[in-house]
UniProtKB/Swiss-Prot annotation:
Residues 1471-1481 have a biased composition (Acidic residues). A lipid is attached at residues 524, 1396 (S-palmitoyl cysteine). Residues 654-831 are annotated as: Disordered R region. GO terms for biological process: bicarbonate transport; cellular response to cAMP; cellular response to forskolin; chloride transmembrane transport; intracellular pH elevation; membrane hyperpolarization; multicellular organismal-level water homeostasis; response to endoplasmic reticulum stress. Residues 99-122, 217-222, 320-339, 880-918, 1012-1013, 1117-1130 are extracellular. There is a cross-link at residue 688 (Glycyl lysine isopeptide (Lys-Gly) (interchain with G-Cter in ubiquitin)). Pfam families: ABC_membrane, ABC_tran, CFTR_R. Residues 1450-1462 have a biased composition (Basic residues). Monomer; does not require oligomerization for channel activity. May form oligomers in the membrane. Interacts with SLC26A3, SLC26A6 and NHERF1. Interacts with SHANK2. Interacts with MYO6. Interacts (via C-terminus) with GOPC (via PDZ domain); this promotes CFTR internalization and thereby decreases channel activity. Interacts with SLC4A7 through NHERF1. Found in a complex with MYO5B and RAB11A. Interacts with ANO1. Interacts with SLC26A8. Interacts with AHCYL1; the interaction increases CFTR activity. Interacts with CSE1L. Keywords: ATP-binding, Cell membrane, Chloride, Chloride channel, Endoplasmic reticulum, Endosome, Glycoprotein, Ion channel, Ion transport, Isomerase, Isopeptide bond, Lipoprotein, Membrane, Nucleotide-binding, Nucleus, Palmitate, Phosphoprotein, Repeat, Transmembrane, Transmembrane helix, Transport, Ubl conjugation. ATP 1 binds at residues 401, 434, 458-465, 493. It comes from Oryctolagus cuniculus. This is Cystic fibrosis transmembrane conductance regulator.
Length: 1481
């Protein structure tokens, strides 16, 4: 960054913001980079501001009174705030004085008042000087208030971040990540630009008092008629605002529904294409869009009338003020024009400035109170440790993630004493007080000596991680004692990588010891990985380590924990992402050898680890199932140990499956030992038990399937919607939402689930900070999910290893200087994570405007109609001017004869009725035309938005994966959320405002030019200067706004990164370092934002200076060239003052339109995406026994009429080459093989060899070359849809969208309920569906989180059965399955797909043993394609993977001379059918 010119700028340079010229010049000539931005002033640095506010806040906390954050802010910023407020008031006062001078100038043209004619020129100079003074006062004042608001935001940002790092884990479990981000982005952004309006809460009443005093002098009591009208208008506008909020609240749920489905579609776009669901998804989303647009139109119409009422109230304010006075006493021109000028100022103060100021104070105080409450939440307390002890002891420890009994009792007593409840009531209160669940750990005891290894195993959700947290002090024990030295190192279950180099991640603030460092690198098997990087261990890792594999991240996290010299090492399942061989080597070299003299607690599920551990602790449901040595386990729990050891290759299973088996085994043996608990009772689903949500243990850090679901408190939860009552005593603090909470209902995107959003969206679980830290909602609402890699990892179904960006809800952004708070209420959270800088130009091109206007044919005619109506209004205004001109001479004669007044009277009692009848008629006509002329425009622009959304949705669904792979999922979702919301809400009314303001200015210039042609000459250079200045500024401002948005992303990214690694941070004591990083991110954003504010003020000031010069020219031309005729001077000067304010408003609106049109440019960019290659072909009639919906019949040279295709499933692959993107490297090269009908083929290859890619290539989801034929039909001869329907797909990651069971199984509604039930029965899904209320009509939300992964796989299997496909593709379907569901799937595959061709990608040997042939993929090509005997006879990958026991199963008579040439396929021993049926759920 460059040094700021502000530091050396002089007083005038600072006053006129001239120091920004270099950056404006550079931005106009070229694209700005981050290096071009100026450094921030030292006074604005986050370090200084946070230290200042923190000192005052600590002072508040130390005081005996209740601490108030507003007092701390007052002591920091009050005097500067008041200084700029006074400047603002003085600038506003000049607006009240200007009409007085205008009246004197008009009066000087009275023939009877020739004395003042000589001073008219001086009065004109005085009027011009008032404009100059106003400009010099207002702009520094507004900038100063913006600057103070920015400083307040920075200081509170830092205070909140520091507090977040100190919060206890219990508090973190109660705060959703959305609420925390909302606290930062939503509430604090109110200070930045809102602070300039705050002073109007006292300026406006003073101004109204001054103006009414001046109007009283002119019109006496009739002046209050105009004020009364303005007050009524303000109340009407408030009522319209409430009505608009009601419509927006209703619409929020519909938008939410649409975005959830859209998000699920985007995240699972490969599955959508594989299933050929494009049309079904498009229809589903468009139906939701239709309902949403009905409410959008209503809200837009209300806001339109609200806006129009302000523009056209001017007629009636003047009319009602002047009419009573004119009818009783007559009126003169000077009073008319002075009244008009006063009323313009009065109208702005009453209907705009004061309501805005009240709203600003309401929002700001609400935000301050929220932050104040947050800053007083319970902090993490470091436990006191005995540094001399060498052992680790836990004695009868019980702990709750919720508050313990004692804490609740004390809180209850405190609450009752505060409310002065009697003792009897106190006891009653406590007896009814909800104790919020069972303990997470109960009566845990163990003791390990120095240098011993304790292996902790247990069922899913048993409390293993909670045990480690309690040792670290993150979870306070309610009972019992813990003893250890306190020198702890910690390795999290989910590897956490901070932004920085590999070396920095491992050392992590500990002093560097080269020998220890290299030893750790070697023990953690990182040497080979580091050597592959160009920069070695100085390679910079992005946030979350997205450039690393899961195994590399896990090993770096382990190395970090091992490198630290500690007494106790807590290792929470550190080997989850490692392959078997690597895991074994690291366990031996690192855990057993390098750390042999250290005390270690290892969470694991491997028998090998249990055997080598000094002590074993097995947990089940929070209790100790066993504690002792492995030999004691075998002797004391022989059934349990023999059951686990009875599994062949138990340690070879995936971690998920090992945990599943361990959970099932522990559950069975624990139930057998507890006769009081029936097995069936424990199998009941949680939603069948009334009130269980309030009673079930909230083990939120554990697996989400077993942990408690957290629902929003909504009028109708999904359980209640489906006919089930739910516990209604949930704490208000647990009110959770899809997006962060908001106080007002104006949000374009839904602000919370407090709105009844209908069947699709209710009951969505909260993503608490604690859940984020433990990754325990990996299947949460997909609306938050974003992939952060530039190209999605390809497989049959998109990857769902999500990053912190995934959980962020998306609100609309504030893309321009427009008062978006009026429409959107708050900054969109997704603005925290903006899209990549794309090819959108810095200024919207004319081509974009032209395309936008021609999207809908009616739009051009609507614009023409608006202009014609405007011309009618101008003509009506000229009629009024004609009336003025014709009545003035006559009235002057009458007044002279009567001698009733010494002033030139324009309207007398005799002529007033004639004049006012015409005036009222003209005014009513103008009002009717004005109020309704823009309605067709707004209506048509919303229709344009509807068309663009439809085209964009269609383009995304039809786009090839090679194009979609280059886009981020979050970027695509931004188009459907932020940009479509802008097209729906902001753009129509902003375009209307701009056109209206522009026409007002043009009309005023036309009238002035008719009255004084010389003035037209002055307008030409002014308009030219305005156009040039706008173009000059716009190039830079849009780039600065883009850089500012980019600068916002690291702030929130760093916050969430810190939260994900908070336990690690605390264990290593790295909070100060991360506070420094956060301040750097804040300073980077501040530099961009401060420069944007400065350049914006430079532009606003230059615009006003040009208009001041224009007014000076108009004033002197009118004063010097106009002879007799005070009416003409009054009209010219009044309109010139109006032009000055309106044209400036129009300039700002034009900038807003340009900024909002960038959203249109982005939408057009998506609409213009290429589509997948589809070749039409003629179809023939189906055979009599087949339906067209069930099979695809193609007219092809290879297929005879009336044949069903595919009939056998024979598949021939010739020279297949596949790429992810057009310009990328080939992932698969020259693949050729053939599969016989009904054959089962297994794909073999190492991780990353391209097995899943091959399955995607079969479906033409990639860029492919070569040819594939199915039953003689080439894929080049039929359409993509027809080709893909030939395949059934069972992906590893199952796609369950928000909708009913029926919709998920049959989105095209082709099958009857009877057929669906039949298939559900075949795949073992019937009993699952029947237990839900509504059965097939039960609404699944959040990716079907109420279903286990096995049930989801069964759903996928049912889809394939319904599709009647002859070729089945399976991509590791059993990777996350429990043994029961796995057996069901195996049985179904044998029965339902007995005559189908099956292509299986699987890591489990027992599944692969059923394949007849194997395709071995190495180095992007086919290495072998052989039978199983051939592979076993050679040194192949398969031979290395298969164990001797598996070979014995496969070939039981291998040494017999009578064995057949074809292998005997023997199924693994299955559980009895009765057992499967009894334990399926």
């Amino acid at each position: 960054m460059q040094k700021s010119p502000l530091e050396k700028a002089g007083v005038l340079s600072k006053l006129f913001f001239s120091w920004t010229r270099p950056i404006l010049r550079k931005g106009y000539r070229q694209r700005l980079e981050l290096s071009d931005i100026y450094q921030i002033p030292s006074a604005d640095s986050a370090d200084n501001l946070s230290e200042k506010l923190e000192r005052e806040w600590d002072r508040e906390l130390a005081s005996k009174k209740k601490p108030k954050l507003i007092n701390a802010l007052r002591r920091c910023f009050f005097w500067r705030f008041m200084f700029y407020g006074i400047l603002l008031y003085l600038g506003e006062v000049t607006k009240a004085v200007q009409p007085l001078l205008l009246g004197r100038i008009i009066a000087s043209y009275d023939p009877d008042n020739k004395v003042e004619r000589s001073i008219a020129i001086y009065l004109g100079i005085g009027l011009c000087l008032l404009f100059v003074v106003r400009t010099l006062l207002l702009h520094p004042a507004i900038f100063g208030l913006h600057h103070i608001g920015m400083q307040m935001r920075i200081a509170m940002f830092s205070l909140i971040y520091k507090k977040t790092l100190k919060l206890s884990s219990r508090v973190l479990d109660k705060i959703s990540i959305g609420q925390l981000i909302s606290l930062l982005s939503n509430n604090l952004n109110k200070f930045d630009e809102g602070l300039a309006l705050a002073h109007f809460v006292w300026i406006s009443p003073l101004q109204v008092t001054l103006l009414m005093g001046l109007l009283w002098e002119l019109l006496q009591a009739s002046a209050f008629c105009g004020l009364a009208f303005l007050i009524v208008l303000a109340l009407v506008q408030a009522g319209l605002g409430r009505m608009m909020m009601k419509y927006r609240d209703q619409r929020a749920g519909k938008i939410n529904e649409r975005l959830v489905i859209t998000s699920e579609m985007i995240e699972n776009i490969q599955s959508v294409k594989a299933y050929c669901w494009e049309e079904a998804m498009e229809k589903m989303i468009e139906n939701l869009r239709q309902t949403e647009l009905k409410l959008t139109r209503k809200a837009a119409y209300v806001r339109y009338f609200n806006s129009s009422a302000f523009f056209f109230s001017g007629f009636f304010v003047v009319f009602l003020s002047v009419l009573p006075y004119a009818l009783t006493k007559g009126i003169i021109l000077r009073k008319i024009f002075t009244t008009i000028s006063f009323c313009i100022v009065l109208r702005m103060a009453v209907t705009r400035q004061f309501p805005w100021a009240v709203q600003t104070w309401y929002d700001s105080l609400g935000a301050i109170n929220k932050i104040q409450d947050f800053l007083q939440k319970q902090e993490y307390k470091t436990l006191e440790y005995n540094l001399t002890t060498t052992e680790v002891v836990m004695d009868n420890v019980t702990a709750f993630w919720e508050e313990g009994f004692g804490e609740l009792f004390e809180k209850a007593k405190q609450n009752n004493s505060d409310r002065k409840i009697s003792n009897g009531d106190n006891n009653l209160f406590f007896s009814n007080f909800s104790l919020l669940g069972a303990p997470v750990l109960k009566d845990i005891s163990f003791k390990i000596e120095r240098g011993q290894l304790l292996a902790v195993a247990g069922s899913t959700g048993a409390g293993k991680t909670s045990l480690l947290m309690m040792i670290m002090g993150e979870l306070e024990p309610s009972e019992g004692k813990i003893k250890h030295s306190g020198r702890i190192s910690f390795c999290s279950q989910f590897s956490w990588i901070m932004p920085g180099t590999i070396k920095e991640n491992i050392i992590f603030g500990v002093s560097y010891d080269e020998y220890r460092y290299k030893s750790v690198i070697k023990a953690c098997q990182l040497e080979e990985d580091i050597s592959k990087f160009t920069e070695k261990d100085n390679t910079v890792l992005g946030e979350g380590g997205i450039t690393l594999s899961g195994g590399q991240r896990a090993r770096i996290s382990l190395a970090r924990a091992v490198y630290k010299d500690a007494d106790l090492y807590l290792l929470d399942s550190p080997f989850g992402y490692l392959d078997v061989l690597t895991e074994k080597e690291i366990f031996e070299s690192c855990v057993c050898k390098l750390m042999a003299n250290k005390t270690r607690i290892l969470v694991t599920s491997k028998m090998e680890h249990l055997k080598k551990a000094d002590k074993i602790l097995i947990l089940h449901e929070g209790s100790s199932y066993f504690y002792g040595t492995f030999s004691e386990l075998q002797s004391l729990r022989p059934d349990f140990s023999s059951k686990l050891m009875g599994y062949d290759s138990f340690d070879q299973f995936s971690a998920e499956r090992r945990n599943s088996i361990l959970t099932e085994t522990l559950r069975r043996f624990s139930l057998e030992g507890d006769a009081s608990i029936s097995w069936n009772d424990t199998r009941k689903q949680s939603f069948k038990q009334n009130g269980e949500l309030g009673e079930k243990r909230k083990n939120s850090i554990l697996n989400p399937v077993n942990s408690m679901r957290k629902f929003s408190i909504v009028p109708k939860t999904p359980l209640q919607m489906n006919g089930i009552e739910e516990d209604s005593d949930a704490s208000i603090e647990r009110r959770l939402s899809l997006v962060p909470d908001s106080e007002q209902g104006e949000a374009i995107l839904p602000r919370s689930n407090m709105i009844n959003t209908g069947p699709m969206l209710q009951g969505c679980r909260r993503q608490s900070v604690l859940n984020l830290m433990t990754h325990s909602v990996s299947q949460g609402p997909s609306i938050y999910r974003r992939t952060t890699t530039s190209a999605r990892k390809m497989s049959l179904a998109p990857q769902t290893n999500l990053t912190e960006m995934d959980i962020y809800s998306r609100r609309l952004s504030q893309e321009s200087g427009l008062e978006i708070s009026e429409e959107i209420n708050e900054e969109d959270l997704k603005e925290c994570f903006i899209d990549d800088v794309d090819s959108i130009p810095t200024v919207t091109t004319w081509n974009t405007y032209l395309r936008y206007i021609t999207v809908h044919r009616s739009l051009i005619f609507v614009l023409i109609w608006c202009i014609v109506i405007f011309l009618a209004e101008v003509a009506a205004s000229l009629v009024v001017l004609w009336l003025f001109g014709n009545t003035a001479p006559q009235d002057k004669e009458n007044s002279t004869k009567s001698g009733n007044s010494s002033y030139a009277v324009i309207i007398t009692n005799t002529s007033s009725y004639y004049f006012f009848y015409i005036y009222v008629g003209v005014a009513d006509t103008l009002l009717a035309l004005g109020l309704f002329r823009g309605l067709p425009l707004v209506h048509t622009l919303i229709t344009v938005s509807k068309i663009l959304h439809h085209k964009m949705l269609h383009s995304v669904l039809q786009a090839p994966m090679s194009t979609l792979n280059t886009l981020k999922a979050g970027g695509i979702l931004n188009r459907f959320s932020k940009d479509i919301a802008i097209l729906d809400d902001l753009l129509p009314l902003t375009i209307f405002d701009f056109i209206q303001l522009l026409l007002i200015v043009v009309g005023a210039i036309a009238v002035v030019s008719v009255l004084q042609p010389y003035i037209f000459l002055a307008t030409v250079p002014v308009i030219a200067a305005f156009i040039l200045l706008r173009a000059y500024f716009l190039h830079t401002s849009q780039q600065l706004k883009q850089l500012e948005s980019e600068g916002r992303s690291p702030i929130f990214t760093h916050l969430v990164t810190s939260l994900k690694g908070l336990w690690t941070l605390r264990a290593f004591g790295r909070q100060p370092y991360f506070e420094t990083l956060f301040h750097k991110a804040l300073n980077l954003h501040t530099a961009n934002w401060f420069l944007y504010l400065s350049t914006l003020r430079w532009f606003q000031m230059r615009i006003e200076m040009i208009f001041v010069l224009f007014f000076i020219a108009v004033a002197f031309i009118s004063i010097l060239t106009t002879g007799e005729g005070e009416g003409r001077v009054g009209i010219i000067l009044t309109l010139a003052m109006n032009i000055m304010s309106t044209l400036q408003w129009a300039v700002n609106s034009s900038i807003d339109v340009d900024s909002l049109m960038r959203s249109v440019s982005r939408v057009f960019k998506f609409i213009d995406m290429p589509t997948e290659e589809t070749k039409s072909t003629k179809s023939i009639k189906p055979s009599s026994n087949c339906q067209l919906s069930k099979v695809m019949i193609i007219e092809n040279q290879h297929v005879k009429k009336d044949d069903v295709w595919p009939s056998g499933g024979q598949m021939t692959v010739k020279g297949l080459t596949a790429k992810y993107i057009d310009s990328g490297n080939a992932i698969l090269e020259n693949i050729s093989f053939s599969i016989s009908p009904g054959q089962r083929v297994g794909l073999l290859g190492r991780t990353g060899s391209g097995k899943s890619t091959l399955l995607s290539a079969f479906l033409r989801l990639l860029n492919t070359e070569g040819e594939i034929q199915i039953d003689g039909v080439s894929w080049d001869s039929i359409t993509l849809q027809q080709w893909r329907k030939a395949f059934g797909v069972i992906p590893q990651k199952v796609f369950i969208f928000s909708g009913t069971f029926r919709k998920n199984l049959d989105p095209y509604e082709q099958w009857s309920d009877q057929e669906i039930w039949k298939v559900a029965d075949e795949v073992g899904l019937r009993s699952v569906i029947e237990q839900f209320p509504g059965k097939l009509d039960f609404v699944l939300v959040d990716g079907g989180y109420v279903l286990s992964h096995g049930h989801k796989q069964l759903m996928c299997l049912a889809r394939s059965v319904l599709s009647k496909a002859k070729i089945l593709l399976l991509d590791e379907p059993s990777a996350h399955l429990d043994p029961i569901t796995y057996q069901i799937i195996r049985r179904t595959l044998k029965q339902a797909f007995a005559d189908c061709t099956v292509i299986l990608c699987e890591h489990r040997i027992e599944a692969m043993l059923e394949c007849q042939r194997f395709l071995v993929i190495e180095e992007n090509t086919v290495r072998q394609y052989e039978s199983i005997q051939k592979l076993l006879s050679e040194k192949s990958l398969f031979r290395q993977a298969i164990s001797s026991s598996d070979r014995a199963k496969l070939f039981p008579h291998r040494n017999s001379s009578k064995h057949k040439s074809r292998p005997q396929i023997t199924a693994l021993k299955e559980e009895a059918e009765e057992e499967v049926q009894g334990t399926r759920l």
